[in-house]
């Protein structure tokens, strides 16, 4: 099986696919900017995956089925999305937001390709920053009084079963998608991360997180390794030169705001609703 993945490992849905590929021991190529075909159809939406040079697909739950995992039920997928609440706080500190994204290393072995992609990747980060703030301004999402509540359905489910993972003796779609959410929360720490660490009601969730981190101890895209046991190293960064290229690109995006901002909204309209 030949797999090409477009995406950045800050996305929970990209993480779910990468975790699935790692679990199945399937080699893949990861690119940090969208292929032209993907850009024309879906903008910068991620992940996008092509299997054996077939058509690109963007629904992570469906991609996991193609990789050999059982489908996730609609109500479970909704519970995964509920656990993603709080994502809007990623942009509370713009400097931290851009600094953390600058550390996402492109995987190409070619210096020229890495440099080009890290420059262009700055637009995707600019897009994400604009999108999150646009949603905050228009929808004005309210913080819950208790961030831990969004995990209680998972806690109850885990406590009622005997297996190490939600889907049995090995991780399945529910495990991969939910663990992807945790990676997103940990990549730029947001308020929903804290109850996973210390809420007395979420003992089972911490046991599950420990099981996942042991299972994926050699997974190269894990951000939660600094927050839960056993500890796992953070993803390897791109190096100072490539970070500098990213920030040069980011400065260019802001300098060209009359062009880049309208482009962001054009690409937003391509995202399926």
Locate the predicted segments by residue.
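GST-like fold's C-terminal all-alpha helical module
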Residues: 90-207
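Juxtamembrane amphipathic/hinge helix adjacent to a transmembrane helix
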Residues: 149, 193-241
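Acidic carboxylate-rich catalytic motifs and surrounding loops in phosphoryl-/glycosyl-chemistry enzymes
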Residues: 32-35, 171, 222-227
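GST-like domain detector, emphasizing the conserved glutathione-binding G-site
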Residues: 1-122, 166, 248-273
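Membrane-penetrating hydrophobic segments
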Residues: 238-251
């Amino acid at each position: 099986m030949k797999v090409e993945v477009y995406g950045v490992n800050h996305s929970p849905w990209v993480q779910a696919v990468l975790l699935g590929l790692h679990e199945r021991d399937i080699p893949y190529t990861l690119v940090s900017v969208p292929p032209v075909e993907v850009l024309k159809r879906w903008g910068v939406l991620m992940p996008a995956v092509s299997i054996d040079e077939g058509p690109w697909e963007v629904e992570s739950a469906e991609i996991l089925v193609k990789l050999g995992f059982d489908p996730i039920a609609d109500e479970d997928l909704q519970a995964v999305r509920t656990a993603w609440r709080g994502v809007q706080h990623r942009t509370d500190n713009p400097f931290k937001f851009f600094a953390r994204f600058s550390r996402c290393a492109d995987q190409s072995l070619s210096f020229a390709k890495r440099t080009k992609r890290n420059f262009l990747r700055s637009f995707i980060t600019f897009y994400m920053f604009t999108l999150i703030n646009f949603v905050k301004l228009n929808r004005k999402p309210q913080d819950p009084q208790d961030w831990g509540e969004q995990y209680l359905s998972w806690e109850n489910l885990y406590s009622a079963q005997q297996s190490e993972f939600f889907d049995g003796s090995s991780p399945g779609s529910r495990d991969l998608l939910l663990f992807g959410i945790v990676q997103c929360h940990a990549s730029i720490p947001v308020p929903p991360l804290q109850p996973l660490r210390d809420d007395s009601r979420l003992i089972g969730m911490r046991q599950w997180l420990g099981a996942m981190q042991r299972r994926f101890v050699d997974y190269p895209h894990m951000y939660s390794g600094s927050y839960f046991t056993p500890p796992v190293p953070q993803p390897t960064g791109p190096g100072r030169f490539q970070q500098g290229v990213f920030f040069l690109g980011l400065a260019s995006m802001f300098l060209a705001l009359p062009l880049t901002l309208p482009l962001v909204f054009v690409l937003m309209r391509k995202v399926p609703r």
